[in-house]
């Protein structure tokens, strides 16, 4: 498992690493939104990132089911 994580972190263009980076960004913005509830641009950014991550996960599911399972776990 750590071998795969190292491969993903070295290859920032891979779908798995993009999903991981989007997830980290969404979590960071969600924490920000917890303290700044009326930050509507942040809400919009989170929605856009969620849609992008959903599309990448769908692509990964169609192309590489093992990679999809690794990302989801």
Curated annotation (Swiss-Prot):
GO molecular function, one term: structural constituent of ribosome
UniProt-annotated location(s): Plastid, Chloroplast
Keywords, in A-Z order: Chloroplast, Plastid, Ribonucleoprotein, Ribosomal protein
Pfam families: Ribosomal_S15 (PF00312)
Keyword Ribonucleoprotein: yes
Superkingdom of the source species: Eukaryota
Major localization listed first in the record, in broad terms: plastid
InterPro entries per UniProt: Ribosomal_uS15, Ribosomal_uS15_bac-type, uS15_NS1_RNA-bd_sf
Gene Ontology biological process terms from the UniProt entry: translation
Any one Gene Ontology cellular component term annotated for this protein: ribosome
Assembly and interaction partners: Part of the 30S ribosomal subunit.
HAMAP family: Ribosomal_uS15_B
Family (UniProt): Belongs to the universal ribosomal protein uS15 family.
Protein name per UniProt: Small ribosomal subunit protein uS15c
Organism annotation: Welwitschia mirabilis (Tree tumbo)
Taxonomic lineage: Eukaryota, Viridiplantae, Streptophyta, Embryophyta, Tracheophyta
Gene name of the record: rps15
């Amino acid at each position: 498992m750590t071998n795969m994580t190292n491969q993903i972190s070295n290859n920032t263009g891979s779908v798995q690493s993009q999903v991981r980076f989007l997830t980290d960004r969404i979590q960071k913005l969600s924490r920000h939104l917890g303290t700044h509830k009326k930050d509507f641009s942040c809400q919009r950014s989170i929605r856009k990132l969620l849609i992008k991550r959903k599309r990448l996960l769908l692509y990964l599911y169609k192309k590489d089911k093992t990679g999809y399972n690794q990302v989801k776990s």
